[in-house]
């Protein structure tokens, strides 16, 4: 799915560019925006906001989109 790939790559780019601490925070903001445009994403967005590492966030995106 192209949308899933774009979102995953965007999250990875945020982590790579901003580093772990800021990258995780910025990824939360962007996932919240993406969530407004995805079906059945409320629980995913809520869970994503509790994640504290890039690895957890990347795994969550993969799991949500079944990548």
Place the predicted regions along the sequence by residue.
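Alpha/beta catalytic cores of nucleotide-metabolism and tRNA/nucleoside-modifying enzymes
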Residues: 1-67
């Amino acid at each position: 799915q192209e949308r899933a790939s774009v979102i995953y790559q965007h999250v990875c780019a945020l982590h790579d560019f901003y580093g772990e601490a800021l990258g995780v925070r910025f990824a939360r903001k962007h996932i919240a925006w993406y969530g407004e445009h995805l079906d059945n994403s409320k629980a995913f967005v809520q869970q994503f906001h509790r994640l504290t590492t890039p690895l957890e966030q990347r795994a969550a995106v993969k799991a949500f989109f079944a990548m």
